[in-house]
Amino acid sequence: KVDELKDKEAYKKEWNIDGWQASLDRMTPEQREAWIASYKPRNEKFINENLKGEDLVKWKYQRYIKDYVRCIKSIDDEVGRLIAYLEKEGLMDNTVIVYTSDQGFYMGEHGWFDKRFMYEESFRTPLIIRYPAKIKAGSECTALVQNIDYAPTYLDIAGIEKPDYMVGTSLVPLFGGETPKDWREYLYYHYYDYPAIHMVRRHDGVRDSRYKLIHFYGEKNEHNDAISCNELYDLQSDPNELNNLYDNPEYADIQTRLQARLDKFRVDQKVDEY
């Protein structure tokens, strides 16, 4: 737990060596020993090579992608162990399996590693559900869902009424393959943790089944100009979000519609900065 760290303030500012050391304090002695055994030789090799320019960029990418793939392999192995146990105990048909994450990830797309931006690579979240009694194997759903829908879904499956204070909508109505007519048509996103270690500018936005509007905002930059810029994408014709259509006359109606919806989200969610 963060509250149990020796240096909580350093951990919150982990872009420096003190913060890095504080993050190691989260590990048990056994975990720390395993971490050092794995990374110390590679780190020392990196320091001794004193890489520059393109060689440094390639090294960073290889380090990142290998750790990323190893993480996927580890998760796959552990999920496999869980499924093997359920099969052994005869519990597979009496268990709902949900495979998901808190976001997607960038591996160089948009010149970025990590997450946080509203572009599709991190905005789209993995979600696989196995529920033989309700969901046909291999079926797909294109409805707009959010992670705030998970808890109401679990309660619904268990036959428990959702508390009034809980946001989100049960996904159970989607299990049959049809999307209810009153299902949500838009998603709202807001990132506001700036300045911070990742230095991602504040932005919010709205997405429907095809289009996305993003608004970047914030304090003055090095040119003494207040940051305020917008991006509009057609995700059907431009899935990689490389062609900004904002202020394109051909998309004026779409831009106006999305802006109106974004403004409504800001009011409904009591957003006080944008």
What are these regions (language model features)?
Residues 1-145, 157-165, 222-227, 249-253:
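Active-site-proximal cap/lid insertion segments
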Residues 103-109, 148-151, 156-231, 235, ...:
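C-terminal cap/loop subdomain of S1 sulfatases and analogous C-terminal strand-loop tails that border
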Residues 175, 246-249:
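A general structural motif at alpha-helix termini
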Residues 238:
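Intrinsically disordered, low-complexity polar regions and short flexible loop motifs
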Residues 241-245:
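Carboxylate-dense, calcium-coordinating segments in secreted/extracellular and ER-lumen proteins
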